[in-house]
C-alpha cells in the first residue's frame, strides 16, 4: 500500500501552485486518500495565513468535512509521490482521466464555484460551463 505524501511536501506543492489556491475561501479543504482502506487523509486547508497541509483521520465520506476528495489507487499514489515536488497537477489530471484517481465533489457545483474552486477544478481537468443550477 502506498503511503500518503509528506505534509510538508504537500504544502510546498500548494505554494508552487499558489494561483490555484488564492481564490479559495478560508475554510476550503481538499483531501487525498488511498483508495483501499483509507484510515488517514492528507488535507490542504485554506486559512487566513494561506494553505496549510496536514494528515488527519479519515472518518468516511459523509463526515470527512472536505469540499473535494481525491481517492488514488496504489499506482496513482506512487505517481503522486513522484510528482509532488514537480508538476503535481499534470500528474493528478492524467490519473483522473485514466481512472486511477477518483475526484469526489462533496459540495454542489454552485457551492464550489462560490468558494473559489473554479481554477483548481480546471487544473484537474474539470471545466464548469453555463449557469449554476
Model features per residue range: what roles?
Residues 1-133:
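Feature captures hydrophobic
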Amino acid at each position: 500500500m502506498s503511503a500518503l505524501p509528506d505534509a510538508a511536501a504537500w504544502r510546498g506543492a500548494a505554494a508552487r501552485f499558489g494561483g490555484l489556491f488564492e481564490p479559495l475561501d478560508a475554510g476550503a479543504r481538499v483531501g487525498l486518500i488511498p483508495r483501499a482502506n483509507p484510515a488517514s487523509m492528507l488535507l490542504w486547508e485554506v486559512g487566513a495565513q494561506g494553505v496549510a497541509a496536514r494528515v488527519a483521520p479519515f472518518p468516511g465520506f459523509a463526515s470527512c468535512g472536505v469540499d473535494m476528495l481525491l481517492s488514488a489507487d496504489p499506482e496513482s499514489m506512487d505517481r503522486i509521490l513522484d510528482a509532488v515536488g514537480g508538476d503535481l497537477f499534470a500528474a493528478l489530471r492524467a490519473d483522473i482521466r485514466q481512472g486511477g484517481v477518483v475526484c469526489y465533489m462533496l459540495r454542489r457545483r454552485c457551492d464550489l464555484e462560490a468558494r473559489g474552486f473554479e481554477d483548481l477544478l480546471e487544473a484537474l481537468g474539470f471545466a464548469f460551463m453555463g449557469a449554476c443550477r
